[in-house]
């Protein structure tokens, strides 16, 4: 956070808040990677150096400790440059198309996949935002590219891959968390 008020609330609730985010990395346009890089650099300036960076975004609360351990094991086993979590796409990408302003579905109607059963199409995967792992050295490099060479996918099931972007996602997450707690 860049807010002293939120930092104090966090401290009051037991969180460690070693420093506030810079103004540069506090805007809506700041990337998560820029913020993580800032944290690594600031700790480095204090003489605290880390080998590995694991980003667990709070908007993906359904991942489990097992997912974190298994993705880290994959990172180590493959000697990966990075690992990111993914899940199978719910609907085949072959059924996706762009709509023009006229809303005509020509691109779908003319698609060779329109009558193809989903089960016969190749599986596709999407980033789910739950887990990102890379070396701190990679994070600090001038040519940082998380998805470059030797980036491996850790596949997670759909029920743990919810990324909360709106009120509907939040309601679904709450429902799934209640179900998990039973």
Kindly give the residue locations of the regions a language model identified:
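Short beta-strand/loop segment that forms part of the nucleotide-sugar
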Residues: 1-3
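Short phosphate-binding loop-to-helix
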Residues: 5-54, 62-66, 70
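Residues that scaffold the ATP/ADP-binding catalytic core of kinase and kinase-like folds
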Residues: 9, 18, 108, 141-142, ...
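A short acidic, often aromatic-flanked loop/helix-cap motif at beta-alpha or helix-coil junctions
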Residues: 24-28, 91-92, 159-162
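Conserved core of the sugar-phosphate nucleotidyltransferase
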Residues: 29-34, 38, 61-150, 154
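Short, glycine- and charge-enriched coil/turn segments that flank and shape catalytic ligand pockets
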Residues: 44-49, 78-79, 101-103, 182
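Hydrophobic helical membrane-anchoring modules
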Residues: 153-155, 159-182
């Amino acid at each position: 956070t860049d807010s002293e008020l939120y930092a104090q609330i966090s401290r009051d609730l037991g969180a460690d808040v070693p420093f506030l985010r810079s103004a540069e990395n506090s805007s809506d346009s700041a990337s998560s990677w820029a913020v993580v890089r800032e944290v690594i650099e600031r700790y480095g300036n204090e003489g605290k150096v880390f080998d590995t960076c694991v980003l667990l975004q709070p908007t993906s609360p359904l991942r489990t400790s097992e997912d974190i351990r298994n993705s880290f094991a994959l990172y180590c086993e493959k000697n990966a440059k990075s690992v990111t979590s993914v899940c199978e796409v719910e609907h085949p990408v072959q059924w996706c198309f762009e709509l023009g302003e006229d809303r005509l579905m020509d691109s779908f109607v003319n698609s060779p996949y329109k009558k193809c059963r989903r089960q016969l199409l190749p599986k596709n995967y999407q980033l789910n935002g739950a887990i990102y792992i890379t070396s701190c050295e990679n994070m600090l490099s001038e040519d940082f590219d998380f998805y470059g060479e030797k980036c491996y996918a850790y596949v997670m099931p759909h029920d743990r891959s919810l990324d909360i972007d709106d009120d509907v996602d939040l309601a679904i997450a709450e429902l799934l968390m209640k179900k998990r707690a039973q």
